């Protein structure tokens, strides 16, 4: 979709240390480590009505499990086998970090994810959208691939202990807030455009049906 291509172009430009914003009103980007901005969260929980089990996907981030999953693969193990991910917290899959399996919880409620995942919060809550885009940007995916450990390709992973030690040239927290607002606005516009497109498709389908009745 054109909106997504536009978003990728804007984000690629915005995340380049060489670009200038408003006559360089922000400080020069400095090298720092990811662990300086995150706090690991480890709250054990279970798959319940208060903390329903969700998926972490490369395409859509954190999403509710499908009805089919609950019908066919409902987990019945006792105990707290999962980790809680509160709204705004990130879930991180070490096995698929290089594919972009890192995402914040935008569902609006606390959910449960696989106990294998790492959960972390950002120290500055108003930078969530910046980190959502930065951590899954193309240069970062390449970086994860380069530092992944494991003898077999299909079992390579980037442990959370490696992840937090990644040092990159990063914008100041002030600029992170600015970029976060910009990315959030872009996401909202894209969501509205996609909703409108779905409505138009439904209208088109309905009209086509009426034509051939």
What are these regions (language model features)?
Residues 80-138:
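A short beta-sheet element
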Residues 21-46:
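Non-catalytic DNA-recognition/assembly elements of restriction-modification systems
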Residues 25, 75-81:
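Short, conserved secondary-structure segments in the cores of folded domains
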Residues 95, 111-116, 151-174:
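A short glycine-rich beta-alpha junction/loop motif
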Residues 1-27, 169-213:
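Amphipathic alpha-helical coiled-coil/heptad-repeat segments
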Residues 42-77:
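DNA target-recognition patches
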């Amino acid at each position: 979709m054109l909106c997504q291509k536009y978003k990728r172009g804007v984000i690629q430009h915005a995340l380049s240390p060489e670009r200038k914003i408003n006559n360089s009103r922000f400080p020069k980007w400095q090298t720092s480590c990811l662990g300086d901005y995150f706090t690991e969260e480890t709250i054990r929980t279970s798959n319940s009505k208060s903390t329903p089990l969700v998926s972490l996907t490369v395409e859509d981030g954190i999403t509710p499990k499908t009805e089919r999953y609950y019908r066919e693969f409902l987990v019945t193990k006792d105990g707290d086998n999962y980790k809680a991910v509160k709204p705004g917290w990130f879930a991180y899959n070490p096995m698929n970090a290089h594919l972009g399996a890192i995402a914040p919880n935008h569902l609006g409620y606390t959910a449960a994810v696989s106990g294998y995942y790492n959960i972390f919060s950002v120290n500055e809550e108003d930078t969530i959208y910046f980190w959502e885009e930065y951590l899954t940007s193309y240069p970062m995916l390449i970086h994860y691939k380069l530092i992944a450990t494991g003898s077999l390709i299909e079992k390579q992973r980037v442990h959370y202990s490696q992840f937090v030690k990644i040092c990159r040239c990063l914008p100041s927290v002030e600029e992170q807030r600015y970029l976060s607002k910009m990315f959030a606005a872009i996401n909202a516009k894209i969501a509205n455009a996609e909703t409108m497109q779905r409505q138009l498709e439904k209208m088109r389908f309905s009209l086509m049906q009426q034509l051939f009745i």
